[in-house]
Every structure is written in C-alpha cells, then in structure tokens.
Regions:
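NAD(P)+-binding Rossmann beta1-loop-alpha1 motif at the extreme N-terminus of oxidoreductases
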Residues: 1-63, 67
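Conserved short alpha-helix immediately C-terminal to the canonical SAM/SAH-binding motif I
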Residues: 39-40, 76, 101-104
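Rossmann-like NAD(P)(H) cofactor-binding subdomain of soluble oxidoreductases
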Residues: 80-133
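Internal alpha-helical scaffold of NAD(P)-dependent oxidoreductase catalytic cores
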Residues: 137-222
Length: 286
C-alpha cells in the first residue's frame, strides 16, 4: 500500500496529470501541482484536485515532493529535468505518462543523481479532449497501465508504480521493456490514429456528415486529435510507426489487388481472417 504521509507533485495539469491529481487527492494523499497555465492551475485548486500549486518560483514544491508525476510531452519533460532535476530530494521516486519511452527513459535515468529514481509508466487512457477541465471524464478502470522498468530500476520503484496504478483505479497493470512498449504502441495506438487521420484527410467529406453511419463515426472518432502532442509522439517513435504503416499499406494493397482482379475468394479469405482475429482479441481483452 502506498504511504499516505508522502507528498505528491504533479508537473503538468493536463488531462492525465489532472486525473492523477484528482484520484490521488480523493484517496487522501497530499497533492501539489505545477502548471504553465494560470487558468488551469486555478481550476485544479478550485475543484480540490491539488492542495497548492504554482506556475513559477516552484522550487520549494519540487524539493518537498516524495513522488513526482510528470504530465509533460517528452521534449518538455527532458528540458524540465535538465533545468530542475537537481532539486529532487534523495529518495524521490518519480514517473511520467508519456506514450513513447525510447529516447526519454535512458537520458532521464542518466541525469538522476544517486538516491533519485525514474520508473517510466504509461496510462493508456487518453481521450480526444484535453486539459484539466476534462480530467474527471477519464475512466481509468478499463484502461491498461504499463510499467516499463530498466536494469537501473529497483524492485521497490516497480512496486510503487504498480501500487500507484491500483490507487488510480486501473484494473489491468502489466510490465514491458522500453523497446517492447514502443513497438506495441506503434501498432495498437499510433497506427490507429494514423489511419483515422488519413481517412479524414483523404478528401473533404464534410458534406457527407448527414449520411454517415456507425462504422464511419467509430473509425474516425480518434481523428479529432491533439496536433502538437501526436506530432511529437509520431516523430519520437517514427521507426516503429513507419514499419507498421508499411505492413498496413501492404494489407490494404492486397485488398486493392483482389478488387482489381475480381478475386472474390481472396476478399472472403481476408474477411474470414479479420473476423477470426477480432474474435480472438475479444476473448483476451480485459
């Protein structure tokens, strides 16, 4: 069980950072916040997400924190840690919410002084909306929480990350290496967003909105996207994503070839395979 005498600090009160603050405060933990936007910080204060917070001159909050959760984009997290990482006190264990780990975990762990530990993790619970004002809408229970330890992590830090996930309400918690995580995320998350965005960008289809059915709405739901965040995540994981796009393009081209050749048997075979794999997925899904 997490020690409720420990002080938590959320750096970046966006959608996920705000949700972490909300759930930890509800569970009885002392939570402070740091955020660039005064308006979002005030929202978190007014709604009881955090006990105190600052937009600047926040060094005291960093020094006091026993645990820190970074709700920042990877580039911003690296820059923040280069400037303020020396302020973290001995014994501090901290984590992130980033959807990409390669290029982030190793540099930050290398910058940690003795007695300070970074255990990376990823709550797979993002939404089309952003900002702390929508944090209460996020439901962690059905989502996956992934811990990505390295050889530099202690068993105590890994256990802390798992217990944190439990307090936050996650029901499915797993462990992957950094490389496994980024390969997986390139397929199950980033490729899906790439397909949805490409479908919406293929032509100007706004005139068809009154005719669309559930299939179009379901497939393009995630196309309403945070452009800055997803551009960064795509570029940080571009090797894995390009590989997945190439495989997807190959499968789509097979379907195109079957259509050109009037190959009904090939089409039916593809449909059967997709149905079988989806059924297997449904059985394994938490």
């Amino acid at each position: 069980m997490l020690d409720k005498s420990k002080r938590y600090l959320i750096v970046g009160l966006g959608l996920l950072g705000g949700k972490y603050a909300l759930e930890l405060s509800r569970a009885g933990f002392h939570v402070d916040g740091i955020n660039r936007s005064e308006g979002h910080l005030q929202y978190a204060l007014d709604h009881g997400y955090i006990a105190s917070g600052k937009t600047h001159d926040f060094e005291d909050l960093v020094r006091q924190a026993d645990h820190i959760i970074f709700g920042l984009y990877p580039t911003a997290l690296l820059e923040w840690f280069r400037i303020y990482g020396h302020l973290l006190k001995e014994g501090c264990i901290f984590t992130d919410v980033s959807g990409v780990k390669t290029g982030l975990v190793e540099p930050i762990q290398a910058m940690c002084r003795p007695g300070v530990e970074f255990i990376a993790s990823h709550p797979m619970a993002g939404r089309e909306t952003s900002s702390v004002e929508h944090a209460a809408e996020v439901n962690f229970a059905p989502a996956n929480f992934i811990v990505t330890p390295t050889e530099k992590n202690t068993p105590e830090a890994v256990q802390w990350a798992r217990e944190l996930a439990e307090v936050l309400g996650f029901k499915h918690i797993c462990t992957l290496t950094v490389q496994e995580h980024d390969r997986m995320i390139g397929y199950v998350s980033q490729l899906c967003h790439a397909i949805a965005v490409s479908l919406m960008c293929a032509n100007d289809n706004t005139s068809l909105c009154e005719y669309t059915g559930d299939s179009f709405r379901d497939l393009t739901r995630i196309a309403r996207i945070n452009d800055k965040m997803w551009a960064e995540l795509f570029l940080w994981n571009k090797e894995n994503l390009i590989s997945e796009i190439d495989q997807f393009s190959g499968a789509l081209n097979e379907m195109r070839n079957a259509l050109v050749a009037d190959d009904r048997e090939m089409l039916e075979e593809m449909f059967r395979l997709s149905t079988q794999r989806r059924a297997a997925f449904d059985k394994k899904a938490p």
